[in-house]
Amino acid sequence: MLRNGQNQAQLLARSLGQLARGMASSKRVSSKKEDLKPKLPKPPTVEIPMEEPLNASYLSKTLGSSYRSWAAALEKHPELKTLKRKDLLSSYDTLKSLDYSVDDIIAKPMIIYYGATTLANRHSVLQECGFHNVTVQTLAKYVTVVNKPIEVLKAHNYIPFDVKVAERLAGYFKDIKLPVDLRELESETLTLKSLRQSLINAYLRERLQMDDNDLQKLWRVYTRIRHKSFRAVQDTIELLTKEFNFSAERLRKNSFLLYSEADNVRRILREVPTIDSQDIREIGFRRPKILMSTCDSLKQTLQHVHAFGISEDAVLRCLEVLTLGPDTVLERLRDLQEIEEFQVLGTNPRILRLVHYQNKARLRLDYLNQLRVRCASLHILSCGSEAFAKFARDGSDRTKGRDIVVYLSNVLGKDVQVLRNLLSRHPNWCHIPLLHVKQCLEYLRSKKFKLNEIFANIHLLLYPIKRIEEKMLLLQSPDAQEDLQLPVANFDSLSNNEILTLILYLIESEFHFTGDGIWTEQHTHHVENFNNLLPDFPESLNKVYKYGVKPAEKMIMERL
């Protein structure tokens, strides 16, 4: 249909004749019932709860102590007011489990500003080093303390004089012989920080076969590992190797996992055992960064995804979304409904790529709009920087049609390949933006055309709504009915299917059945002239990581 002008004109004329004969003999009776087809999910009313800043009244009622004490603490440390209540309660529960009272916390109120995991780790480190009484004051000064020489800590009675710190720390490494001479580490002029780092280096050399380069990167990039207890590091490595089948090499390449919490990972195994029937162990192995998210965050993120009618299969197509915070995911899911070009992709199985890359996608969409590029596919909005730069420079205002066929498959309930085969009969179908297809379909639905009737005339979705309206009005005029020699008394005698077929015929007859009827006046021969209209690609793309182009890719940009 519409491939070659003259041949297609003959085909359409023949079809019109058959249509007329069919109308003369009998009128097709429309079905009373129409199968319900899935539509784009409506935005659910999921809101991020708004919290009031922490105040003395809430703290005194929730944690205890007097209103006056907390008021004084908040006045002295106003940054405490920015703490989220769930984080506050989590830190308080940890401090409580470590036998600190509310009065202890009031004495050093900023202690509760630290995260629960940080507090637990630091307390464990000090215990491993031989501190016989870890007070809340000591815990609050943790960074200062571990940077002190061991002899100074013993002189101030933090560590008993008879404790051999190096030997004590080495003893926490079980079932492994450290490749280090402890006699070289017995000097009490060493700081706790340097002693612990020497021992953890020896352990990682033996357990994960890390070399000097691996260790240098570890301490340069993932410095927080030095604040994790030896027992916790070993527990994490054993869990990852046994439950997730991580090899030593894979752990070296993803050394940030050494800071993951073993107890949290165990919770994930128990409470999120599968995603769309796929074992969480396989998922964690594929995307190790997911294991750095808390179990509660993963569960909440999945709840938000479900609330917006997005399947878990979509999660598997973009596992990176699980590395975002749940509040961020919820906010971005809601934002999808605010931008028409994003909202129309709501049923696309790769929709979560727009959630993960939303900031980049917004910038790219704005930039392409400035270039008057209408066909911005989900892939182009979320692909790598090099691919996007090439697309923008080439100036080809077209897609491969995947977004269109996926959308129509969800709405019409038809096979993707069937739709592609039908649409590909039109030479220009890939030059039509998905948003227009959606708007045209909604327009036809508003005129009471059924989905099966639209499917039978699917190419009409590619045409400007204004032209469809014009031809629909034209068909209602007696002159047009006479010119077309329709064997019916009036317009109302035509079936919906016949009306759509005639509209398509009338539009393309003006363009000699070449398929050019899809272009509006603003976009006539848009593709052919696009390269002449394309402005210079902005230099900012080579300097600032904007629209997805990193500074390191400047040479690539120059070659494009």
Curated annotation (Swiss-Prot):
Annotated function: Binds promoter DNA and regulates initiation of transcription. Regulates mitochondrial replication and transcription. Required for normal topology and maintenance of mitochondrial DNA (mtDNA) levels. Regulates mtDNA replication by re-activating replication after replication pausing. Likely to regulate replication pausing by coordinating with the mitochondrial termination factor mTTF which promotes replication pausing.
GO CC annotation: mitochondrial matrix; mitochondrion
Keywords attached to this entry: DNA replication, Mitochondrion, Transcription, Transcription regulation, Transit peptide
Record's protein name: Transcription termination factor 5, mitochondrial
Transit peptide: 1-23
Record bears the keyword Iron: no
Gene this protein is translated from: mTerf5
Chief place where the protein resides: mitochondrion
InterPro entries: MTERF, MTERF_sf
Chain segments carrying region Disordered: 23-47
Cell compartments where the protein resides: Mitochondrion
